[in-house]
Design a protein with these regions (language model features):
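Protein kinase glycine-rich loop
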Residues: 27-34, 38
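Conserved N-lobe beta3->alphaC-helix segment of eukaryotic protein kinase catalytic domains
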Residues: 49, 54-75
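A short, aromatic-enriched beta-strand patch in the conserved N-lobe beta-sheet
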Residues: 85-86
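Conserved short submotifs of the Hanks-type protein kinase catalytic core
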Residues: 91-104
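Activation segment signature within eukaryotic-like protein kinase domains
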Residues: 123-124
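Conserved catalytic-loop aspartate of Hanks-type protein kinases
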Residues: 201
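Amphipathic regulatory helices of Ca2+-sensor modules
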Residues: 312-313, 344-357, 380-391, 416-428, ...
Length: 465
């Protein structure tokens, strides 16, 4: 019965009407615009640094803002900015997200001028992987540009993070979009014509790729009108002075990404298969000890324990630092051979065989059924973290107390059946109440119809035995 319950990362994004300063120490201003401010902040419980976007209510299109929060709360990919919480008070909305310390890609491009192909490759690979994943979830970004790409330094690995999903929306394959979104240099011609699909993102990525390699855009002009006219014309060139040293494969990929007709333009999945990447992609070695630990934890992950799964997901999303996830992130990226942002049965088998020799495909099939919390047949980054994170990092008393208080919505010191149901309401609205009654029965050892902290602690310890 519990197999009916499905949930994704959005179940763990907290919406609060309490004072944000109760949980955060607000620090320096990182950026300021017409609609609000971004400030550095420290989460009091974990001491983690985060970024808080503060938006004045009177200047917001609330429908658009809530759509951005909804989209970010659904996306679980190492190269997409992570959102933690959403606050509201009388004057402002607050979006709490991860803090990226390396600055904008735009600043790096301005400072550096041009990138060698070997330097551009990891940037493009991460960008296209993020967009391939978002397109796979029927989400189009619509405003890809270097100013919306952050660099985050985690250990020795610079990571690209796609930000500003305010112009993003859900799309369907049989329905074109018409609202003009984007920035003149990077906008696709079909967006200007107001009939377009998700391939507009591929055009924008093609422009970014072009600029990385030569330092100027393919469609230039002295004014926005001139730039847009040149985009509409769609003609671009590879002047010998800058492009003579650039490989034919790079030029071929740019041509395919900047194909004028969207129906003939390459898809994100096809971009990732282009031979240019194989020339310059850095060959990463698997850390065998991390891999072994991850696979052992995956095999032990218990099926049909959705309340425990939700608790683990909440703790990982809200409380485990990026530094503590870094090794597992590298393992996920190593296993994701086609770079589409999810792990398939075949990718798990291949990685497992590299470590242990061989595994029965049926074992992997059952493993995926246990781990695949949203039931889509593949393992996303969030689901991977849920089943591989070290037990000791999850089960600290501080983490369990924080999760318990978050689930105890009315603050009466226990979790009721209605409070359990509220955890799953975003993604499993029509599940029979008997499923939740069984959950309660399994956890409620004293039979009083509610889960106290001691009972909550016990079921979590038991889950990892």
């Amino acid at each position: 019965m519990e197999s009916q319950l499905k949930f994704d990362k959005s179940a763990f994004i907290c919406y609060k009407k309490t004072k944000i300063t109760d949980e955060y120490l607000l620090g320096e201003t990182l950026g300021q615009g017409a609609f609000g401010t971004v400030r550095k902040a420290v989460h009091k419980l974990t001491s983690q640094e985060r970024a808080i976007k503060i938006l004045k209510k009177r200047q917001q299109d609330e429908r658009k803002l809530f759509l951005e929060v909804n989209i970010l709360s659904k996306l679980a990919h190492p190269n997409i900015m992570e959102i933690y919480e959403f606050y509201e008070d009388k004057a402002n909305f607050y979006i709490v997200s991860e803090l990226c310390k390396g600055g904008e890609l735009f600043d790096k491009m301005t400072e550096k001028g041009t990138f060698k192909e070997a330097e551009a490759c990891p940037i493009m690979l991460q960008l296209v992987s993020a967009i391939c994943y978002s397109h796979g979830n029927n989400i189009v970004h619509r405003d890809l540009k270097p100013e919306n790409i952050m660099i985050d330094q985690i250990s020795d690995t610079p990571m690209i993070k796609l930000i500003d999903w305010g112009g993003a929306r859900y799309f369907s394959k049989n329905k074109k979009m018409s609202t003009i979104k984007g920035t003149p240099y990077y906008i696709a011609p079909e967006v200007i014509r107001e009939v377009y699909d998700e391939k507009c993102d591929i055009w924008s990525l093609g422009v970014i790729f072009y600029v990385l390699l030569c330092g100027y855009p393919p469609f230039n002009g002295d004014t926005d009108i001139e730039i847009i006219q040149n985009v509409e014309n769609g003609k671009f060139y590879f002047p010998e002075e800058e492009w003579g040293i650039i490989s034919s494969e790079a030029k071929d990929l740019i041509k395919k990404m900047l194909t004028y007709e969207p129906s003939k333009r390459i898809s994100a999945k096809e971009v990732l298969l282009h031979p240019w990447f194989s020339h310059y992609e850095e060959k990463v070695k698997q850390d065998i000890s991390v891999a072994r630990s991850a696979f052992e934890n995956m095999k032990r992950f218990k099926r049909n324990k959705k309340f425990e799964h939700a608790t683990i997901g909440f703790i990982i999303n809200q409380l485990i630092s990026k530094e503590d996830r870094a090794d597992l992130m590298k393992q996920f990226l190593f296993m994701d051979k086609n770079k589409d942002g999810v792990l398939t049965k075949e990718e798990i088998i291949e990685s497992y065989n590299n470590v242990y020799g061989s595994i029965d495909p049926d074992v992997v099939e059952n493993m995926i059924k246990s781990i695949d919390l949203d039931g889509n047949g593949v393992i996303d980054y969030n689901e991977f973290l849920n089943c591989t994170m070290n037990r000791d990092k999850i089960l600290s008393k501080k983490n369990l107390e924080y999760a318990f208080k978050a689930f105890d919505k009315d603050g009466n010191g226990s979790i009721s059946i209605d409070e359990i149901m509220s955890i799953f309401k975003k993604t499993s609205n029509n599940v029979d109440k008997k499923v939740f009654e069984k959950m309660m029965k399994d956890a409620d050892s004293n039979g009083d119809g509610a889960i106290e902290f001691e009972e909550f602690n016990n079921i979590m310890q038991k889950f990892f035995e």
